[in-house]
């Protein structure tokens, strides 16, 4: 595996869970430009990934100081601008998928590459869904859009490692009807 020399690029750990997967078709949020996106749920126990993201955020902040300064004379402190690394326990307390985890929303105008655990391209859409586990390649960058300042994450590529319980999905027909007693049918 190649050594990453870009301080704003992060490859997450294999226990990262994907949610809100929009990796096959770009989706418009609030009427904006359609983008490919995923919410990356990172266990708090994965301290290596969390530290890599924090380090990349600091590097993006330093690299983007001129952009973050805007028309002002000073750069706002990092703690005063939008940060992509968010605490699931605080921001999504009612969602068990985000318990004891951080999350990062990453998006891109271009489709991410999506591969399996041995780097073969995944072409079957049903193989990638909200709830799978895998690694993600993200790039962290500073932005200043109409005075809205912060650090954001671009989505580069995804590697599915293993299946997981689907998130936010409905029950399958098999699970709804597979255990019913046939004696009651049409009675």
Short names for language-model regions:
Residues 1-9, 164-187:
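Acidic, gly/ser/pro-rich intrinsically disordered tails
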Residues 54-59, 118-121, 169-180:
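Short intrinsically disordered coil segments
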Residues 1-103:
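OB-fold ssDNA-binding interfaces and closely related basic DNA-contact patches used
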Residues 117-134, 141-151:
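Exposed beta-sheet edge/beta-hairpin loop segments within beta-rich domains
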Residues 105-123:
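Beta-strand/loop nucleic-acid-binding surfaces
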Residues 145-165:
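OB-fold/S1-family single-stranded nucleic acid-binding modules
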Residues 42-44, 140-142, 162:
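Beta-strand elements of well-folded, non-transmembrane domains
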């Amino acid at each position: 595996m190649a050594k990453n020399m870009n301080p704003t690029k992060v490859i997450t750990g294999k226990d990262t869970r994907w949610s809100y997967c929009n990796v096959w078709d770009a989706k418009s949020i609030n009427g904006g430009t359609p983008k490919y996106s995923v919410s990356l749920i990172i266990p708090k126990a994965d301290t290596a990934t969390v530290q890599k993201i924090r380090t990349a955020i600091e590097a993006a902040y330093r690299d983007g100081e001129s952009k973050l300064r805007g028309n002002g004379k000073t750069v706002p402190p990092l703690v005063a601008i939008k940060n992509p690394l968010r605490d699931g326990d605080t921001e999504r307390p009612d969602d068990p998928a985000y318990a004891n985890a951080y999350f990062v929303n990453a998006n891109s105008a271009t489709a991410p590459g999506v591969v399996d655990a041995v780097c073969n391209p995944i072409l079957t859409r049903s193989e990638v869904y909200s709830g799978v586990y895998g690694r993600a390649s993200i790039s962290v960058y500073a932005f200043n859009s109409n005075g809205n300042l912060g650090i954001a994450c671009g989505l580069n590529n995804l590697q599915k490692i293993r299946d997981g319980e689907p998130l936010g999905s409905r029950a399958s027909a098999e699970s709804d009807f597979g255990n019913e007693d046939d004696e009651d049918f049409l009675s």
